[in-house]
């Protein structure tokens, strides 16, 4: 096992820095059947009460979004479109809504477990979207608020250093309702060469 990412890394006040930081890191999730791990290759930054695509827009706290207002270092998992759970890493100090959405992971460990969960899906598509990430890792609403430095979900340094030339920066996906915020280049994809 590599070195776990410390709590300090989750306390950044800059969701863009956070989204870039987690590219190339190793996400691991443990259940009673073992551990599934993989390298994060796609993220999106969400942050601050002014971000119309962020669940904390306008500092409105609801039962659904209250996790994003907590101190960084926990998982924010929610159900989207009545179909998918999505995994976010909460960032920053308590009271400021910031998170990084985990959009894509290359599975490196626990492949047999993922093969069971993703029957009939080619390996290259197991976790190449945010809903696919949670299905592959077995993440659901019971993981909302779980520590990211604990024994259920954690992130490690992988030893990978990504050249800036391999990071594609685009607008976020699925947030057309957010006006000018929909066009901001807050999605980051590692285009592995």
UniProtKB/Swiss-Prot annotation:
What keywords are assigned to this protein?
Answer: DNA damage, DNA repair, Hydrolase
Tell me the domain of life: Bacteria
The question of whether Lipoprotein is a record keyword is answered with no
What EC numbers are recorded for this enzyme? 3.2.2.-
GO BP terms: namely: base-excision repair
- Annotated protein name in UniProt: Putative 3-methyladenine DNA glycosylase
Q: Which organism is it from?
A: Methylacidiphilum infernorum (isolate V4)
Which InterPro entries does this entry report, sorted A to Z?
Answer: Formyl_transferase-like_C_sf (IPR011034), MPG (IPR003180), MPG_sf (IPR036995)
- Which HAMAP family does the UniProt record give? 3MGH
Q: Which residues form a coiled coil?
A: none
Q: List the disulfide bonds.
A: none
User: Molecular function (GO) terms listed?
Assistant: alkylbase DNA N-glycosylase activity; DNA binding
Q: Which family does it belong to?
A: Belongs to the DNA glycosylase MPG family.
> What NCBIfam families does the record tag this protein with?
3mg (TIGR00567)
PANTHER family reported in the protein's UniProt record: DNA-3-METHYLADENINE GLYCOSYLASE
